[in-house]
């Protein structure tokens, strides 16, 4: 998509609307590609250490972007799995952020 003299990628719009840093967006994208995934699987897939991923995933859960749920293992114990919130829910959040930006930009132009 192009806006005046600058090309804007949809990834930038999504990341900006959801308040994601570049490194967080990579995790977000990996979650979008999976139905649900464990910390260990994500760590291996993205080549990120578990501590870094835990911080990012906690932030995602706190910001209601991702669901965390527990799966009990057959041999005892459990593993936490992470799943992205529904895409339609996220689209609504992104569109709301875009509308807010648009209104702010419009007011700024009117005040100019």
Kindly give the residue locations of the regions a language model identified.
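A short, conserved structural fragment
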Residues: 61-71
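Pre-recognition alpha-helix immediately N-terminal to the DNA-recognition helix
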Residues: 25-29
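Basic amphipathic alpha-helical segments that dock to polyanions
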Residues: 31, 42, 53, 57-63
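Short, Lys/Arg-enriched N-terminal segment that forms or immediately precedes the first helix
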Residues: 2-18
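Amphipathic alpha-helical dimerization/coiled-coil segments
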Residues: 87-112
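Short acidic, hydrophobic short linear motifs in intrinsically disordered regions
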Residues: 36-44
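Short, cationic-aromatic polyanion-contact patches
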Residues: 13-23, 38, 69-93
């Amino acid at each position: 998509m192009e806006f005046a003299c600058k090309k804007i990628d949809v990834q930038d719009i999504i990341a900006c609307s959801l308040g994601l840093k570049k490194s967080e967006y990579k995790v977000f994208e990996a979650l979008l590609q999976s139905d649900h995934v464990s910390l260990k699987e994500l760590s291996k897939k993205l080549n990120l250490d578990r501590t870094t991923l835990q911080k990012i995933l906690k932030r995602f859960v706190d910001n209601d972007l991702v669901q965390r749920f527990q799966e009990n293992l057959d041999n005892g114990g459990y593993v936490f799995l992470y799943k992205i919130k529904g895409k339609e829910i996220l689209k609504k959040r992104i569109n709301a952020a875009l509308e807010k930006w648009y209104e702010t930009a419009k007011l700024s132009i009117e005040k100019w």
